Amino acid sequence: MPKPVIAIVGRPNVGKSTIFNRIVGERVSIVEDIPGVTRDRIYSAGEWLNHEFNIIDTGGIDIGDEPFLTQIRQQAEVAIDEADVIIFMTNGRDGVTAADEEVAKILYRSNKPVVLAVNKVDNPEMRSDIYDFYALGFGEPFPISGTHGLGLGDLLDEAAQHFPKIEEDGYDEDTIRFSLIGRPNVGKSSLVNALLGQERVIVSNVAGTTRDAVDTPYSKDGKDYVIIDTAGMRKKGKVYESTEKYSVLRALRAIERSDVVLVVLDGEEGIIEQDKKIAGYAHDSGRAVVIVVNKWDAVKKDEKTMKAFEENIRAHFQFLDYAPIVFLSAKTRKRTQTLIPVIDEVNESHSIRIQTNVLNDVIMDAVAMNPTPTHNGSRLKIFYATQVAVKPPTFVVFVNDPELLHFSYERFLKNRLRESFGFVGTPIHIIARARD
């Protein structure tokens, strides 16, 4: 189910990004050996006292040359739309400013829980200066120091008090939830309509637990599905409707509720950098992934075109080498019937569980084929492996020294697992652990 979302809002230069980095810590770093996988730090995961959440740094949203107050309003709009709790950041050294009051008016009308933080209170003597902030109307201000990390515990304690209770979505456990993500105008809505137009539709739109997404349940061949559609959302201001970062925010909320993610590309326009960013989030999520090339009817082609396009996808999306590719046209509905069987296949792969003895036979055969690496005279020894999770399949490999498992050898082991067990459309995680 979706994690609660905290948004950090405030005028420029109050330290929003510093607090964001303090809260997410090492989670901002992306450990990925394949070049070209770009990440946007606007949205990341955090954890506090067993509370997991996602956090938005609205300071990472670039409005361009809009007037100052317009920027603030639009920044707050993102927070109001996306967040369960808002941290309203101010600067204790500056006192209450007119811009702070402007933000306060917007947030006050939102009816969202707001926790007021006064940053840059770097020593106890400065605490006596924060009482003016009561005038903003959000109760007790929390003095913090982004530079030194002071006061963040109390701030997060208060934010966690406002997290919504986790509710089940009401669908059966066997129901496959899939979302369509992609930049604007790649044809997500058209594809949803094409899928629904072919099948018996259960006529009910259930409002999802994620704001701005509509769940559409339907059945095919006795199986139940839910399409989590991010394409039918109400229009935002023109500035945000055109910014790629806002598209990413919407996609992330849909991914979190999905079993399978369809990364939709525009076959006519080809691949651009934003496609790679959005696909990267699908990969990072650990969900099963299918790459869908839409508008294939509009592409001038011969017998080599599809193969060339597939090779181009593989070159750009090396990190999604496990994801199957489906070419179709939502407009003409050509090949759309091939999509659901692929969704079924990757969803099944996502839940594969391997018996421990069979798993270890494959691992030991792999080691015999390609001996483990050495580093500074020490050789990696693999004692045994076990599967600890599904969705995605996750394996713990017990070794003499986890530091000796180089990413290239880990990749080799993953490839051997795929050759042996399939794992079509699903990432595989391998965790090296020292044997006691």
Curated annotation (Swiss-Prot):
EngA-type G domain: residues covered: 4-167, 176-351
Positions of GTP 1 binding: 10-17, 57-61, 119-122
Gene3D superfamilies named in the record: 3.30.300.20, P-loop containing nucleotide triphosphate hydrolases
Biological function: GTPase that plays an essential role in the late steps of ribosome biogenesis.
Annotated SUPFAM superfamilies: P-loop containing nucleoside triphosphate hydrolases
One Pfam family this sequence matches: KH_dom-like
Keyword Nucleotide-binding set for record: yes
NCBIfam families, A to Z: GTPase_EngA, small_GTP
HAMAP family: GTPase_Der (MF_00195)
Gene (name only): der
Family: Belongs to the TRAFAC class TrmE-Era-EngA-EngB-Septin-like GTPase superfamily. EngA (Der) GTPase family.
InterPro entries linked: G_ENGA (IPR031166), GTP-bd (IPR006073), GTPase_Der (IPR016484), KH_dom-like (IPR032859), KH_dom-like_a/b (IPR015946), P-loop_NTPase (IPR027417), Small_GTP-bd (IPR005225)
Gene Ontology MF terms in the entry: GTP binding; ribosome binding
Record-linked PANTHER family: GTPASE DER (PTHR43834:SF6)
Name this polypeptide is given: GTPase Der
Residues annotated as signal peptide: none
Stretches assigned to the KH-like domain: 352-436
GO biological process, one term: ribosome biogenesis
Keywords per UniProt: GTP-binding, Nucleotide-binding, Repeat, Ribosome biogenesis
Binding residues for GTP 2: 182-189, 229-233, 294-297
Domain of life: Bacteria
Complexes and interactors: Associates with the 50S ribosomal subunit.
